Amino acid sequence: MATSQRKILVTSALPYANGPIHLGHMLEYIQTDIWSRYQKLRGHECHYICADDAHGTPIMLKAQQLGIAPEDMIAQVNKEHQQDFADFNVAFDNYHSTHSEENRLMASDIYLKLRDNGYIKSKSISQLFDPEKSMFLPDRFVKGTCPKCKSPDQYGDNCDSCGATYSPTELINPKSAVSGATPVMKDTEHFFFDLPAFEGMLKEWTRSGALQVEMANKLDEWFEQGLQQWDITRDAPYFGFEIPDAPGKYFYVWLDAPIGYMGSFKNLCAKRPELSFDEFWGKDSTAEVYHFIGKDIVYFHSLFWPAMLHGSGYRQPNSVYAHGYVTVNGAKMSKSKGTFIKARTYLDHLDPEYLRYYYAAKLSSRIDDLDLNLEDFAQRVNSDLVGKLVNLASRTAGFITKRFDGKLAKINDTTLTEAFLAKQDVIADFYESREYGKAMREIMALADIANGFVADAAPWQMVKHDDQQEAAHQVCSNALNLFRILVTYLKPVLPRLAQDVEAFFQLPLTWDALGQDLAGHEIAPFKAMMQRVELDKVNAMVADSKDNLQVTADAPKTAAPEKIAKASSVSSEPLVSDPISETINFDDFAKIDLRIARIVKAEHVADADKLLKLQLDIGGETRQVFAGIKSAYSPEDLEGKLTVMVANLAPRKMRFGMSEGMVLAAGPGGSDLWILEPHEGAQPGMRVK
């Protein structure tokens, strides 16, 4: 057990109940599930809860299109969502729906407390009304040009381009997303949450460490713009909860959606009487509450939600963790390219553990977008999980079963075991801080050491000699013990594999038992645990995704790239021989993560005419990069220098090893190359902006 048991409640954002889960959604649930499983592995009391977000005009309209009741539609979607999550080994302690009695009571309770405390204001407003459909239009059902940055095709409540929030009446050239008609103005009585009253509290909370630095900085911009009262009302017809004492008026979906965290936990408490709702949500609670969300809903979770809780007498979350978007093959998910992949389509073709590992290997605590490069995905899974991890057991377990009665030897030389155990605190810290990519690199570095040990010892040669039987027993037992430690470290990421390994070892894999002595312990016969990723299956998944997905919202329009004009003077010689490339938009450039790196070590690469192997320190992390600069630099000239590297370039498998990025250099090539060197004061890991 952990030395000091924590009480933790963790949530993922609620998926909307009008469509299927896709691989963009899965990033968040896998990220949260890994963190929750890690906490439980350490012996903490951790409850992972979620629910379907089941209210709003989109659900009402879609149910009408299908000719069924909204209740029937959301029940079917809930069933599909839960099955997808279960098949991806996402282990919720409770999965519920915002369309529940628990949530209705919680929403009413919070609203009435806010009202009684003076935080609900009522006023008549002019709102956009669809004259063709005879309905007031929710913010997300009005589209037009952003009043702040002038980006076209933006929703009526916030701009995806600049992040600004505004009233739908501020949109330029608004159109109804329901009928396409130009909306007209109509008066209606609405209730507003007095968000500006909480500005002081929110400024203190957002700078308390509850948010990532990037999020807190973004909120400062919103504070500078001034907080606005928040409209929490929608008019009938609407699918949701009616506001107490206000017939025909309904709670806006974003009021009762986050309350769904509380409603789901209420539901769990009813199933498990030993749990106390107030112990986790009461104002004086000492339990921990964490929300994992996407960066697109930061405003709601970091301003409205903590203010609502504070104003109604409940506790605020300890932290809100945001992540970036998922791209596929370097671009926005696309139906036409087959890269907008439903969770179920993936499951029809590939093992969910593959994606869990790949996402973990690329996740950090930052809000950067994550690219699912399908070629790199197959290569990394095959190299790390099949070639390194499972191969460690498959190469040695058979000898234990066939030659040593299935029993492990007492390991005489524990040097490797001690080295592996010495990494547990480092790996634990990475899991806790959501630096999963760093944890995976640490674990795979250990796997390389273990495989090198087996390759050097070659037990398959030892067993051919009578006088080396005990040595072979030692090597294979040592290798399997290292394998057990590695899989225990990976248990939060690969729960199904961990389960198979527990059956193989015939004992549970627990963090507290990492150093367990297995001398004389009997193992089960080894069975295949993981197959290689076959590219034909990846291609089949992409092909299926071209046919069976709903049309998604159009991407923001960008200007077509144009060729830059020729250099005006022949004296600009580099531009003549190497013209400037086509223009790209800022978003494409922003995807490149440039970092200051110190060249710790440089060395020649055997049988390579142009390459040097560089070990780069990027601030607490070391990367290996093969650079084609051998003709311009000798290794000793480079060591200790600072340079600039592309840090988020997908790792590339070369015949000399894995290259984990790219250093930047200028010049035509050969001996005429100059690496970029920043001025004094730059430090490894700094972002180049």
Curated annotation (Swiss-Prot):
Cofactor note: Binds 1 zinc ion per subunit.
One Gene Ontology cellular component: cytosol
Keywords: Aminoacyl-tRNA synthetase, ATP-binding, Cytoplasm, Ligase, Metal-binding, Nucleotide-binding, Protein biosynthesis, RNA-binding, tRNA-binding, Zinc
Domain tRNA-binding: 588-689
Enzyme Commission code(s) on record: 6.1.1.10
PANTHER family to which the protein is assigned, alphabetical: METHIONINE--TRNA LIGASE, METHIONINE--TRNA LIGASE, CYTOPLASMIC
Subunit structure: Homodimer.
Name recorded for this polypeptide: Methionine--tRNA ligase
Lineage: Bacteria, Pseudomonadati, Pseudomonadota, Gammaproteobacteria, Alteromonadales
